[in-house]
Regions:
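Hydrophobic helical h-region of N-terminal Sec-dependent signal peptides
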Residues: 6-11
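Secreted/periplasmic proteins
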Residues: 4-5, 20-136
Length: 136
């Protein structure tokens, strides 16, 4: 009987259609122009006109959909740096991304973000978030 249950679980797991998609919300800010041309943690040079961001733990190259919860505007950004290092903030975005999201004048915005692509080998559903909501 135990073998039968094990086989059923393996078959169900093999044909499972969905992966978990994590979403997180919090405060986002954007980089000052001072950082243009400075080296980022991911190795490249910072460019405030690109659609990139900093996240504390997600792998470099991870693509995120970021939505400003105040106006429902969204952008797609690539994780290229580490941070933010200000308590309560979840992302540092480039000024270009902040303009698209409509919060340059405010300095910060309450955003939600979700992983839309992870170029690294690490599976998306193994990444640990704080205060995550998981949907299938």
């Amino acid at each position: 009987m135990k073998q039968y249950i094990l086989v059923c679980c393996l078959i169900l797991g093999a044909f499972s259609s969905g992966r978990l998609c994590a979403q997180e919300s919090g405060t986002a800010s954007f980089y000052d122009n001072y950082f243009n041309g400075k080296k980022m943690a991911g190795g490249g040079l910072f460019d405030n006109t690109k659609m990139t961001c900093a996240h504390k733990t997600l792998p470099f190259g991870t693509m995120l959909k970021v939505t400003n919860l105040a106006n429902d505007k969204s952008v797609t950004v690539k994780v290229t740096d580490r941070g933010p290092y200000v308590k309560g903030r979840v992302l540092d975005l480039t000024k270009a991304a902040a303009k698209e999201l409509g919060f340059v004048n405010n300095g910060t915005a309450h955003v939600m973000y979700e992983i839309i692509r992870d170029d690294k080998a690490e599976p998306v559903d193994s990444i640990q978030f704080q205060n995550s909501q998981f949907i299938t």
